[in-house]
Amino acid sequence: MDEKVFTKELDQWIEQLNECKQLSESQVKSLCEKAKEILTKESNVQEVRCPVTVCGDVHGQFHDLMELFRIGGKSPDTNYLFMGDYVDRGYYSVETVTLLVALKVRYRERITILRGNHESRQITQVYGFYDECLRKYGNANVWKYFTDLFDYLPLTALVDGQIFCLHGGLSPSIDTLDHIRALDRLQEVPHEGPMCDLLWSDPDDRGGWGISPRGAGYTFGQDISETFNHANGLTLVSRAHQLVMEGYNWCHDRNVVTIFSAPNYCYRCGNQAAIMELDDTLKYSFLQFDPAPRRGEPHVTRRTPDYFL
């Protein structure tokens, strides 16, 4: 299809998605094919220029994503970096991930979308995205288009050579950013190893490496963060993956910050959400927000396990 014609169509899709109306199956298919072409050119450590606004987990909370854009600025006016976990748990995973992918295809230089541990075939079959696709489309094709696309998402991003952004955390198999650049990311998230760790690990108060209670990834202490940042010339590791009640949380003597962008997570946790604005000198400020007023919830039949991934 002619590029101009596609762009016009894409703008109509984005308009529709902004009203929380899903695309057709065939539209999703062509969107995902286009997105693959763009993402395949991106690095495992995708370079991003400031100013940029960094966001954590969204988890299918579509109306809260709208609130995020209201507070942080519309795309493409604001340059965005999302650190994964677009789907599962919330009621609108389909609309949420479709919108973010559509914005990526339309404004590729102004939005970066990384992979989270929920951007996986296995996890989405347990925590809601698979069932939602089935319910909204009557088959699993859309789930397949998206989960195939997830394999192409960059694992990490580097803002102006200084702020390292990723979903989960560090890995005992990785000392340098070059180690990450050398990984083959075009696969389902493995159960162990460096790629798994980047999407699953958590910072901890205890020093060194520890066994993660999540059953994947590791816990890592302040000594690990400091060593990693120093070795790679970084000032900060910015990550998501954990519910924090204020929406953001510093740890490891400000070597690590956690950002969580799903307010009142799972519609019951009572937390605030936050995003981190980095200006053109890399000065940061946090914007906190509460849930957007919601319409009536769709009826969801299956109750998912209560484990916070």
From Swiss-Prot:
PTM field: Reversibly methyl esterified on Leu-309 by leucine carboxyl methyltransferase 1 (LCMT1) and protein phosphatase methylesterase 1 (PPME1). Carboxyl methylation influences the affinity of the catalytic subunit for the different regulatory subunits, thereby modulating the PP2A holoenzyme's substrate specificity, enzyme activity and cellular localization. Phosphorylation of either threonine (by autophosphorylation-activated protein kinase) or tyrosine results in inactivation of the phosphatase. Auto-dephosphorylation has been suggested as a mechanism for reactivation.
SMART domains reported in the protein's UniProt record: PP2Ac
A GO term from the CC aspect: microtubule cytoskeleton
Subcellular localization(s) per the UniProt record: Cytoplasm; Nucleus; Chromosome; Chromosome, Centromere
Binding residue positions for Mn(2+) 1: 57, 59, 85
The record's free-text note on cofactor binding: Binds 2 metal ions per subunit. Can be two manganese ions, or one iron ion and one zinc ion.
Activity regulation note: Inhibited by the interaction between PPP2R2A and ARPP19; this inhibition is enhanced when ARPP19 is phosphorylated. Inhibited by the interaction between PPP2R2A and PABIR1/FAM122A.
Residue numbers bearing the Leucine methyl ester modification: 309
Major site of localization recorded for this protein: cytoplasm
Keywords: Centromere, Chromosome, Cytoplasm, Cytoskeleton, Disease variant, Hydrolase, Intellectual disability, Iron, Manganese, Meiosis, Metal-binding, Methylation, Nucleus, Phosphoprotein, Protein phosphatase, Ubl conjugation, Zinc
CDD domains: MPP_PP2A_PP4_PP6
GO BP: intracellular signal transduction; meiotic cell cycle; mesoderm development; mitotic cell cycle; negative regulation of canonical Wnt signaling pathway; negative regulation of epithelial to mesenchymal transition; negative regulation of glycolytic process through fructose-6-phosphate; negative regulation of hippo signaling
Result after altering residue 191 to R: In HJS3; decreased phosphatase activity in an in vitro assay; no effect on the interaction with PP2A subunit A PPP2R1A/PPP2R1B; decreased interaction with PP2A subunit B component PPP2R5D; increased interaction with PP2A subunit B component STRN3; no effect on interaction with other PP2A subunit B components
Gene3D superfamilies: 3.60.21.10
Domain of life: Eukaryota
Family: Belongs to the PPP phosphatase family. PP-1 subfamily.
Subunit structure, as described in the record: PP2A consists of a common heterodimeric core enzyme composed of PPP2CA, a 36 kDa catalytic subunit (subunit C), and PPP2R1A, a 65 kDa constant regulatory subunit (PR65 or subunit A), that associates with a variety of regulatory subunits. Proteins that associate with the core dimer include three families of regulatory subunits B (the R2/B/PR55/B55, R3/B''/PR72/PR130/PR59 and R5/B'/B56 families), the 48 kDa variable regulatory subunit, viral proteins, and cell signaling molecules. Interacts with the PP2A A subunit PPP2R1A. Interacts with the regulatory subunit PPP2R2A.
Name listed for the protein in its UniProt record: Serine/threonine-protein phosphatase 2A catalytic subunit alpha isoform
Origin species: Homo sapiens (Human)
